[in-house]
Amino acid sequence: MVYLVDDETVVREALAWLLRSRRLLSEGYGHAEAFEAFLATRDLVADWPDAPVCLLLDVRMPGTSGLVLIERLIERGLIELMPVIFLTGHGDVPTAVAAVKRGAFDFVEKPFSDNALVDRVQQALAASSEAITRRRARQLRQQSLAELTEREREVMTRVIAGLANKLIADELDISVRTVEVHRARLFDKMSVRSAVELANLLREADG
């Protein structure tokens, strides 16, 4: 899905036609406030759709500008899941460049080449797909962490600290065999084969 936010109806219609001709779905909004109202109707961070999305956004619009909107998207944590491509006139190129430095995916200067724009849209959708995959994997890791027992968590903190099974057993006042069982269950639940993999996975889950 490609969201279009531009105050010029003729631009939105032309973009929609172009995207439709390339078999890309789109949905248009005449101003940033309308798009924000759409976003407010759903918790996109907690329940992001499986299909990739991107946003074609005009830099200058009456009311909320594209620059203000992208700042709000950044605040909501949506900028990776929904890459933003700015549509800009020649005089706004420096502004668009600054927006890219803030997190926008890219900008396209008007008048633009159809093929060039579609190429950037497809690249943005690919980036969205990758971000959705990373997010889903992170959610699964966090779910696995939530399913650990208290004892498995105690063993886990010591495993990633580099403690040997004997030391873990002494600290927790349990047998080495019991530590081995908890360690095996921990590795199985977290789908890892070593303490190094476990430590790396936990860092990714926190990210």
Description of each model-found segment:
Residues 61:
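Receiver (REC) domain active-site loop signature in two-component systems and cognate sites
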Residues 184-207:
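Basic, Lys/Arg-enriched C-terminal extension of HTH/homeodomain DNA-binding domains
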Residues 43-57:
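Active-site beta3 strand of CheY-like receiver
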